[in-house]
């Protein structure tokens, strides 16, 4: 597997990042402010010092958190030091976030949808539930699938679907870790496959839409019905299947590769494989919720996630792939060029079909269990 390192300086933030070792390594960010953040490999912050002449202040509410609380606090502390804004993140899956934003449209309680696949952001943009903002990231990225042309959402990371396998469970059932979609139909995996519900999870919908691109819609549903015979359970969250496989509860979990790699980082014995026919990918997006009560802070947060400092940190601690040009990958991260992607797969195009496909999945598969 090959990895690459590229060095690039973003106009908004200059970063000098040394490799993390056993002792704290300084991360220095300079703009019109001075700041020192000391970070260890375990991502512990010892000191944050920063002064900004024009703090925004107030509160910022994020929906869908992406990272565990300790890692979020590193980011929130830095952002607060720069902007004087207290950040709160309410953890939820993409399905719950969509439902909540729609239910609150007359009196929004959140400011930013932070993460989840761009499928969710496209759906919200189609309903005019997000505010246009062409900030740092939007202007940085090329036209195409990575951003909305009107600025209603912008992609800030990539992720690819993979298979998480438990060596212990595989040995018990006498099977190998699957290397293709077709492998998942083998009766040897009966009751041993875990995947999220496409009705609740953007991860699972990315899987479903990828199969529809690869096989055709009707054929994808026929495939899923056959795979359903081997599925032990459908989870609500997209990262749960990888966690369950890593814990040895099931042989195979279908999740994003970065979530599986986080289990490997914990020292858990889990194998990561990719389907040889090709896999689908997500563009994780960010958008400002229409009617945000602190739009200035929301815009500052959107700009912040496109800083090289954030992009590098996000890849280092979460293995999600940066969209900012020149940000090299952390050791162990799987790049887009390292896997076979489904030819012609466009997550933005499939986002427009989400409601119809999810309804069909529920009728033909979900309600039949």
Protein language model regions, located:
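Extracytoplasmic ligand-binding site segments that recognize negatively charged/polar headgroups
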Residues: 61-73, 88, 92-96, 108-249
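Bacterial signal peptide processing site
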Residues: 21-24
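Short alpha-helix C-terminal cap/hinge motif
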Residues: 74-88
């Amino acid at each position: 597997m090959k990895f690459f390192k590229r060095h690039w300086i973003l106009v908004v933030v200059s970063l000098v990042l040394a490799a993390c070792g056993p002792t704290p390594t300084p991360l220095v960010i300079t703009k019109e402010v001075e700041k020192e953040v000391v970070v260890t490999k375990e991502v512990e912050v010892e000191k944050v010092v920063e002064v900004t002449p024009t703090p925004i202040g107030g509160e910022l509410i994020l929906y869908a958190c992406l990272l565990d609380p300790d890692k979020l606090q590193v980011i929130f502390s830095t952002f607060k030091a720069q902007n004087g804004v207290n950040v709160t993140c309410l953890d939820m899956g993409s399905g719950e976030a969509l439902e909540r934003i729609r239910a609150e449209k007359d009196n929004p309680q959140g400011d930013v949808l932070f993460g989840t696949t761009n499928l969710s952001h496209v759906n919200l943009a189609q309903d005019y539930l997000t505010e246009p903002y062409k900030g740092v990231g939007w202007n940085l990225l090329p036209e195409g699938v990575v951003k909305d042309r009107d600025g209603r959402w912008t992609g800030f990371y990539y992720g690819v679907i993979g298979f998480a396998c438990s060596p212990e469970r595989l040995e018990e059932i006498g099977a190998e870790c699957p290397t293709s979609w077709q492998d998942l139909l083998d009766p040897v995996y009966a009751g041993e496959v875990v995947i999220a519900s496409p009705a609740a999870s953007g991860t699972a919908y990315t899987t479903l839409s990828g199969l529809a691109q690869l096989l055709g819609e009707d054929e994808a549903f026929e495939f899923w019905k056959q795979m359903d015979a081997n599925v032990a359970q459908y989870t609500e969250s997209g990262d749960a299947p990888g966690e369950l496989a890593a814990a040895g509860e099931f042989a195979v979990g279908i999740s994003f590769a970065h979530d599986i790699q986080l289990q490997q980082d914990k020292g858990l014995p889990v194998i990561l494989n990719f389907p040889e026919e090709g896999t689908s990918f997500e563009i994780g997006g960010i958008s400002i919720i229409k009617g945000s009560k602190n739009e200035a802070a929301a815009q500052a947060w959107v700009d912040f996630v496109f800083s090289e400092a954030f992009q590098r940190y996000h890849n280092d601690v979460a293995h999600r792939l940066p969209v900012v040009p020149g940000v090299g990958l952390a050791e162990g991260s799987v790049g887009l060029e390292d896997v076979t992607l489904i030819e012609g797969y466009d997550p933005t195009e499939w986002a427009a079909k989400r409601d119809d496909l999810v309804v069909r999945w529920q009728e033909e598969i979900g309600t039949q269990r």
